[in-house]
Amino acid sequence: MILRSYARNISTLAKKSNILKDVTANAGSMTIPTLDSYLNALEKLFVIEDVEAWCPAIRSATTIRSGKKREFTDPSIAVAAMGLTPEYLEQDLKTFGFIFECLCIRDLKVYSSALGGKVSYYHDRSDLGADCVLHLSDGRYALIEFKLGSCEIEEGAQHLLQIKQLVQAANASGKTNLREPDLLMVITGGELAYTRPDGVKIIPIGCLRD
């Protein structure tokens, strides 16, 4: 039940208290310490691997969300835990989108590991966010959004541009001296790779390995 509840919250900022509530609704009583012990075991077994928040000084500390994003080491585990089929995911695109995000994060971790890649996410209370912030060991970093369908690309690109503008504004005000993102990228489930006039790269997930 714990694995299934975690899977239902994949790629979200669900609090442990909410996961516990979901578990106890179907499997009797359980405490947070008990839940923690199970989650720690799942981490050690490389079943789950949460993503930490990126908290740059471009907003007040209380504005930026700092909770962990719930992720699996491999999205197929979450799919199996929920008993989902390809046919179901074709009908439930919202759930498919969360699974797709986990898949993208897994691939980015694998392909960037040789460059010391580390992933995090950015999300503030105004609902502005980047699904992934990929930092390399040499200081370069990318702001990334994951969009399963082409209709959502524009929204994702605008989010990335707004975060870049926040970095620029914070630097201009003297509040910080943060490096500007080296890459803005929307990873999609489509087939076309291109660069928009505003500089945002649109990359199909199948192109990442290249």
Predicted feature descriptions by range:
Residues 185-210:
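Domain-level recognition of nuclease-like catalytic cores that cleave nucleotide substrates
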Residues 87-92, 156-163:
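Short, surface-exposed loop/helix-turn segments at secondary-structure junctions
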